[in-house]
Amino acid sequence: MRKQELIIRLNAKTREERLSAARALRAFMDSGEIVVPEKAGYTNNHVHTTFSFSPYSPTKAVWMAVMSGLSTVGIIDHDAVCGAEEFIEAGKILGIPTTIGFEIRTDWSNTPLAGRRINNPDQVSSAYICAHGLAHTQIAKADNYLKKIRAARAKRNREMTRRLNAVLEPFDIAMDYDADIVPLSCAAFGGEVTERHILFALAGQLIDKFGKGGALVSFLSGPLGIGLSDKQKALLANPDSDIYAYDVLN
């Protein structure tokens, strides 16, 4: 199998397929057919994967870290640790040390920091907190704790989807949470469904309805009243972008 095909398979549907592709790529690395950048002492221990919101599976995230010359890499998904074991195994296969953890959003309304913008740019009295360096023996225990958070967020997500559909109803646009949004996530495998999944599903529907380019820009800036910068308009005017749906989301 060609190297590029193996890289694509790092985002395959099943964990077994993804790790199998990593093993095949490691063989190319060992033979010198794939040149690995020298490690320069940099690390990224806050990497999101498809178990929250990302275009990269845990295995693909590790691959990208190796090919970026990182010395270590860590998985941090919102409200989820079920991608951690795959991430650890991919690190062993591809030869890079890994760390694991998770990120949660916390409410500070009843504290002296109420009303302040802490580290959440979109909301006051709210802060993101990360748990780094989770012991490998505690993954199941952490997941049991995070299940409650995922269940609460699912209720919130459904309400957000309902409200968004109310806004979009005059334009004959509607999303079904279970049919259109959840399948974009790894919820079936213990991943989280985030607000970005909702917006990504909407981006797909907008592209289907208006296409890529001027008509979509006009709808966003006209009927929806979204102020678009010149840079954003330029990005959305490029129908050939490989990440067009992400540009719409953002």
Residue map of PLM features:
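A metal-dependent hydrolase metal-coordination microenvironment
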Residues: 37-189, 193
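Domain-core and long-helix interface of multi-subunit machines
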Residues: 3-56, 68, 148-250
